[in-house]
């Protein structure tokens, strides 16, 4: 059954509903039976169901020009009342707004997916950074420990060397003091003896040794 046949049958069904339950059902002065909420609700549901199907078929057949279709205009005119008019307007508004709704929804879904991708990328990058930190630590730690041990050993040896040098300097100072005493005594003896040390090479050599020495360890 094509769309035209379906539309024809549904139009007949809708008109039959309207014939069985005239427009006074939704008028301002309903009858006793028409006040029954269950009956009214059932009738509204039936009309709404037919109207939704009709509207969908008209949209498939006529597209955006549905309101300019002659058959649709006749049906709309025959069923013009507060209930059907409201239903039609609501359906038409909803159908027109679907494009405006779907676009933000699709964009929101896309942004959510992109956000998840970014969060996943950040998490992965953070994990990689932590791995690199651990790798750097594993490579540098032995070197740092080795350098630290070398510095401690050097500091220990430097302290030992300094102590040894200080001991040597102390011995040199003592030797220098003793030498000064011997030099002074020797010079006095040679000068007081009246012997000319210029004519005696050995005495000249001794006097030369007793001269002022350039080495002075007092500054150490």
Curated annotation (Swiss-Prot):
<dbReference type="GO" id="GO:0031511">
    <property type="term" value="C:Mis6-Sim4 complex"/>
</dbReference>
<keyword id="KW-0995">Kinetochore</keyword>
<keyword id="KW-0493">Microtubule</keyword>
<keyword id="KW-0137">Centromere</keyword>
<keyword id="KW-0158">Chromosome</keyword>
<dbReference type="GO" id="GO:0051382">
    <property type="term" value="P:kinetochore assembly"/>
</dbReference>
<dbReference type="GO" id="GO:0005874">
    <property type="term" value="C:microtubule"/>
</dbReference>
<keyword id="KW-0132">Cell division</keyword>
<keyword id="KW-0498">Mitosis</keyword>
<comment type="function">
    <text>Component of the kinetochore, a multiprotein complex that assembles on centromeric DNA and attaches chromosomes to spindle microtubules, mediating chromosome segregation and sister chromatid segregation during meiosis and mitosis. Component of the inner kinetochore constitutive centromere-associated network (CCAN), which serves as a structural platform for outer kinetochore assembly. Fta2, fta3 and fta4 associate with the central core (cnt) and inner repeat (inr) region of the centromere.</text>
</comment>
<comment type="subunit">
    <text>Component of the inner kinetochore constitutive centromere-associated network (CCAN) (also known as central kinetochore Sim4 complex in fission yeast), which is composed of at least cnl2, cnp3, cnp20, fta1, fta2, fta3, fta4, fta6, fta7, mal2, mhf1, mhf2, mis6, mis15, mis17, sim4 and wip1.</text>
</comment>
<keyword id="KW-0539">Nucleus</keyword>
<dbReference type="InterPro" id="IPR008426">
    <property type="entry name" value="CENP-H_C"/>
</dbReference>
<dbReference type="GO" id="GO:0005829">
    <property type="term" value="C:cytosol"/>
</dbReference>
<keyword id="KW-0131">Cell cycle</keyword>
<dbReference type="GO" id="GO:0005634">
    <property type="term" value="C:nucleus"/>
</dbReference>
<keyword id="KW-0159">Chromosome partition</keyword>
<comment type="similarity">
    <text>Belongs to the CENP-H/MCM16 family.</text>
</comment>
<dbReference type="Pfam" id="PF05837">
    <property type="entry name" value="CENP-H"/>
</dbReference>
<dbReference type="GO" id="GO:0000070">
    <property type="term" value="P:mitotic sister chromatid segregation"/>
</dbReference>
<protein>
    <recommendedName>
        <fullName>Inner kinetochore subunit fta3</fullName>
    </recommendedName>
</protein>
<dbReference type="GO" id="GO:0051301">
    <property type="term" value="P:cell division"/>
</dbReference>
<dbReference type="GO" id="GO:0000776">
    <property type="term" value="C:kinetochore"/>
</dbReference>
């Amino acid at each position: 059954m094509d769309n035209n046949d379906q539309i024809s049958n549904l139009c007949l069904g809708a008109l039959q509903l309207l014939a069985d339950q005239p427009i006074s059902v939704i008028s301002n002065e309903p009858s006793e039976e028409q006040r029954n909420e269950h009956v009214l609700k059932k009738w509204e549901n039936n009309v709404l169901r037919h109207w939704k199907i009709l509207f969908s078929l008209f949209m498939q057949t006529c597209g955006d020009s549905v309101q300019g279709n002659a058959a649709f205009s006749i049906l709309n005119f025959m069923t013009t009342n507060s209930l059907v008019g409201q239903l039609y307007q609501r359906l038409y508004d909803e159908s027109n707004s679907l494009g405006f709704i779907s676009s933000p929804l699709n964009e929101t879904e896309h942004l959510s997916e992109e956000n998840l991708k970014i969060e996943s990328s950040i998490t992965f990058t953070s994990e990689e950074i932590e791995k690199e930190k651990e790798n750097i630590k594993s490579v540098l730690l032995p070197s740092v420990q080795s350098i630290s041990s070398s510095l401690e050993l050097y500091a220990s040896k430097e302290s030992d060397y300094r102590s040894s040098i200080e001991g040597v300097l102390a011995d040199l100072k003592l030797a220098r003091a003793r030498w000064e005493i011997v030099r002074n005594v020797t010079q006095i003896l040679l000068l007081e003896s009246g012997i000319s040390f210029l004519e005696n090479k050995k005495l000249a050599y001794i006097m030369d040794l007793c001269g002022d020495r350039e080495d002075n360890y007092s500054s150490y």
